[in-house]
Amino acid sequence: MIPTSFPPREEIARLTARMLLEIEAVHFRPQEPFTLASGLPSPTYIDCRKLISYPRIRSTLMDFMAVTLLRDAGFEAFDNIAGGETAGIPFAALVAERLGLPMTYVRKKPKGYGRNARIEGVMTEGQRVLLVEDLTTDGGSKLSFVDAIRETGASCAHTAVIFYYGIFPETIGRLQAHGVTLHPLCTWWDVLAEARASGAFDAATLAEVESFLSNPRDWQDARKPADPTKSL
């Protein structure tokens, strides 16, 4: 069912952050930092994949995503909804259902047998495709999915995510340079504000998280493992 009411962006961001905290998808651990895929340390970690196990929350968030897209991209802006393998697939299916549109998904790489395709489902030349993912940090993985979509002759000018880190200033520019507009529901700053309001974390932890969010590169550089070759 297509949504017909449009909550303010600030309220969507606040409620999204609250739900992520409620299901304990948010983790703050400044004393024992997590290791990101890049190998760099981070005091924060978020697991949006948990959302699929909470029907009321996932339904509300998909309503939020649908109204965000209708308001910001247009009511007739898309012909196909594509999920990025693998975390984006369930969310793409839920958004496609709400918007009454076909759904496909994009592999990270060809599976190496059969059709050896990156696109699964029916995507045709000229279709306007929305890419759906669970989150984005610097936007890099989104561009690979967008390129795979465009190789079919379809267009892809928009990507929607539940969570956007919002701390790496180059992200939006990288996507825009590729002709892609990002539509997130909330960022780390929204989560930090809601975490403060909830009282779920101590002041020292929140201060360290804010230090990281304000200048992630410096925070990471100060905590990177020493290069053993430099002592030789």
Swiss-Prot record:
UniProt KW Glycosyltransferase keyword: yes
GO molecular function, one term: magnesium ion binding
EC number of this enzyme: 2.4.2.10
Cofactor(s) needed: Mg(2+)
Listed SUPFAM superfamilies: PRTase-like
Pathway: Pyrimidine metabolism; UMP biosynthesis via de novo pathway; UMP from orotate: step 1/2
Keywords per UniProt: Glycosyltransferase, Magnesium, Pyrimidine biosynthesis, Transferase
A Pfam family assignment: Pribosyltran
Residues holding 5-phospho-alpha-D-ribose 1-diphosphate: 107-108, 111, 133-141
InterPro entries found in the cross-reference section: OPRT (IPR023031), PRibTrfase_dom (IPR000836), PRTase-like (IPR029057)
GO annotation, biological process: 'de novo' UMP biosynthetic process; pyrimidine nucleobase biosynthetic process
Keyword set includes Glycosyltransferase: yes
Residues reported in the UniProt entry to bind orotate: 137
Its job: Catalyzes the transfer of a ribosyl phosphate group from 5-phosphoribose 1-diphosphate to orotate, leading to the formation of orotidine monophosphate (OMP).
Quaternary organization: Homodimer.
HAMAP family, A to Z: PyrE (MF_01208)
Protein name stated in the entry: Orotate phosphoribosyltransferase
Organism: Cereibacter sphaeroides (strain KD131 / KCTC 12085)
